[in-house]
Amino acid sequence: MNETIELKTLDNHNFNAFISRPDSKPKGGLVVIQEIFGVNEHIREVCRKFMKEGYLTIAPSLFDREGKNIELDYTKNDISKGRILKEKYNLLSLNEIKSSVEYVKSAGKVGVVGYCWGGSLAYRSGCELTNINCSIAYYLSLIHI
């Protein structure tokens, strides 16, 4: 089953999250972290694919502090908007991720996977948050050695 739910962060911010629940007992929980485009059809499809593999999957909407359900296109203007939003909410986004981890941890072990900016957040989540058993960063950005 797929649906959008509302969660709350520890700093009392309400945000939406897309949930994909398998029909049978989940193998574990998975937090899917968006790119700079929001929780768009690509991210929802990623959630559905992991759900078909048996995982309780959640994608927090990290731009909800700016406005609900922000979805950007892959155009030059929207990429610019996404970069601005990324900079504005980069540090705060761990709050939404933490609440999402707490939501899916009842399914068992919890993984975090992120794409581009979300990959950077997945890396940070694995380093800074508790209750995460695995963190995967796909083509991450913002990590400097």
Enumerate the language-model features and the residues they cover.
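Serine-hydrolase catalytic machinery in alpha/beta-hydrolase-like enzymes
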Residues: 5-105
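Structured loop/turn residues at beta-strand edges in well-structured enzyme cores
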Residues: 25, 108, 130
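Gly/Ala-rich beta-loop-alpha elbow adjacent to hydrolase catalytic centers
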Residues: 114-118
